Amino acid sequence: MYKLHVRGFSMEDTSCPRKERGTFRAITDKIPYLKKLGITTIELMPAYEFEEQVIPKKTVLPDYLKWESHGEDLIKPESVQPVEKINYWGYVPGNYFAPKASYSSSADAASEFRELVHTLHENGMECVMEFYFAPGMNQNVILDALRFWVREYHVD
């Protein structure tokens, strides 16, 4: 079993065309290499649609809302700027019924993902996926999402 992150697997791979780096297509193109290594199962870290930008729960008001100058001796206090964080890994709730669009080299992420799974199966390999479901999430939604990926994309 080989666990991989779709974007991280090929983002720096110069043998892939630049447009395909970090995409489902790049993994599809690397299947012969993975098969040669003896890998029989690919485990994808979250590849469903999720929010990549972490939105801070506590926001800092912009200067024009919180600071007024009443004289020349006033020194403007330093404002704390929130650091933008990127959720690279995807272990957050998301849209469990869609492949991650930014992991596709084309406008049709669903077809590209379907092609990846189909090509893996043609080469005698399995494709399993990881999902993050928040504690307390409705179990019917979880089961519906898992069934969807099996029926729609034939993941194992």
What are these model-predicted stretches?
Residues 4, 34, 44, 96, ...:
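Conserved, mostly hydrophobic/aromatic
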Residues 9, 47-49, 101:
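Flexible loop residues that form catalytic
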Residues 16-23, 54-122, 135-155:
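Aromatic- and acidic-residue-enriched carbohydrate-binding clefts of CAZyme catalytic domains
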Residues 29-48, 83-84:
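Catalytic domains of carbohydrate-active enzymes, especially glycoside hydrolases
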